[in-house]
A protein has these predicted regions:
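Catalytic-core regions of glycoside hydrolase
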Residues: 1-21
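Carbohydrate-binding surfaces of carbohydrate-active enzymes
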Residues: 14-19, 23-211
Length: 211
């Protein structure tokens, strides 16, 4: 979400000549954890990034931007009775690349992360007292043919399919429900895992109070 600095400064001037104003956002910031939010666009949901900079007058580090300087210049010209102070700039440093030297497998650490819930049917995240993050659905199945056609129904927002711990397919909300073809061994018992991720909850608009 961006706006031309000069155009914004002129809009702020017009408002201040009539009254007061509250700039949103004035200071960029960051949402933490899974609280990033999501925009609703018709039938499509667009998860937002964790950054909450939003092209604000001050960036996420608190440093002034071109937009801040444009509004500051406008204020000095049209409202000279208000004193102007020079903004402060925080020092920053460039970090070198950090090599990844260790990793763990999700499937090898499940017992340490959570406890299983057994059910005859797949339960929704909310039915399990969870509103954000990930759910792993697991079952065992026999393949009736060497090539099986699978479908994930009504999942959101991203689903990753694994067979015996091996990744098979990743689908996003617009792809979920499409056929997934898997080459397996006929009658062989396999473990089927579907990792579902909630990528962000709608935080405004017509879907805000929807089921």
């Amino acid at each position: 979400i961006t706006r031309d600095p000069k155009e914004l400064a002129e809009a702020v001037r017009e408002v201040l000549e009539q009254g007061s104003i509250n700039l949103y956002m004035f200071h960029g910031g960051t949402n933490f954890g899974f609280m990033n939010g999501c925009s609703a666009r018709g039938t499509l949901d667009l998860p937002q990034v964790t950054s909450y900079d939003y092209d604000a007058l001050l960036d996420e580090e608190g440093n002034p931007t071109a937009k801040y300087l444009a509004v500051k210049k406008m204020m000095a010209t049209h409202f000279p009775e208000y004193p102007q102070l020079e903004p402060l700039y925080k020092e920053s440093m460039e970090l070198d690349a950090i090599p990844l030297v260790e990793k763990v497998s999700l499937f090898e650490t499940l017992d340490s992360l959570s406890s299983p819930v057994e059910s005859l049917y797949p339960k929704k995240m909310e039915e399990l007292g969870q509103s954000y993050g990930y759910l792993l659905y697991r079952t065992e199945t026999n393949w009736d043919a060497e090539e099986e056609r699978l479908r994930i129904i009504d999942g959101r927002d991203r689903a990753q399919l694994y067979v015996d711990g091996q990744w098979v397919k990743t689908q996003y909300q617009t792809e979920i429900g499409e056929d997934i073809f898997y080459q397996g061994k006929k009658k062989a018992l396999s473990r089927l895992d579907i990792l579902v991720e909630n990528m962000g909850r709608v935080n405004y608009g017509h879907k805000f109070l929807a089921d």
